[in-house]
Design a protein with these regions (language model features):
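Generic detection of long, well-ordered alpha-helical segments
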Residues: 10-11, 74-81, 133-138
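A broad, low-specificity signal for short, low-complexity segments enriched in glycine/proline
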Residues: 16, 83, 130-132
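Polar, glycine-rich mid-to-C-terminal structural blocks
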Residues: 1-24
Length: 172
């Protein structure tokens, strides 16, 4: 992936595309660092798929829900996302002070408590559109917040946009 902290010039973009062609057509992700810092002030980088903005010494924390299993059952899908998001928040409660990781990893996890629910099986759900995905995001956020509130712990700084899981979505 390529991180830009300023708008690249046309010459910069042309050079990047030349490199892509020379490499056989591989395609890097493009990250707008200015926009990322507006959305997540802790931003220092991203996961390999670049759908999760990460701080220094932080990591992805995702669960998966197979939306293809819920065709015709919108309430069941929302319930599955809600439960997955609650379980996902519980993962942020793990003590990372294991003598191997630096303390910063543990402290960042406690501070950020990043959560996200990945969607698989989206190819089998062409009926889902923007509104439905926004509703699933709100459901995931609600689940993570409710678990935090029940545990008396801070709410996550971010519950990722509910996102597809790449090629996994096509094979599950």
């Amino acid at each position: 992936s390529l991180l830009f902290n300023h708008k690249p010039s046309k010459d910069d973009i042309a050079e990047i595309f030349k490199l892509m062609v020379a490499a056989g057509g591989s395609e890097p992700g493009f990250i707008n660092g200015v926009s990322a810092r507006k959305r997540a002030p802790w931003f220092k980088g991203a996961n390999p798929c670049v759908e999760i903005l990460l701080g220094n010494k932080s990591f992805c924390n995702l669960t998966e829900t197979d939306v293809g299993k819920f065709k015709g059952d919108s309430a069941g899908l929302r319930r599955a996302i809600y439960i997955a998001s609650r379980a996902n928040y519980r993962q942020t409660c793990v003590n990372l002070l294991d003598g191997i990781l630096q303390e910063a990893w543990h402290l960042n996890n406690e501070f950020l408590r990043l959560c996200g629910v990945g969607l698989t099986g989206i190819v089998r759900r062409p009926d889902l559109g923007g509104y439905e995905y926004e509703e699933l995001k709100r459901t995931a956020t609600s689940g993570a917040y409710s678990m935090a509130d029940e545990l008396g712990l801070p709410r996550p700084k971010n519950v990722t946009t509910v996102k597809p899981s790449g090629t996994l979505s096509k094979i599950m």
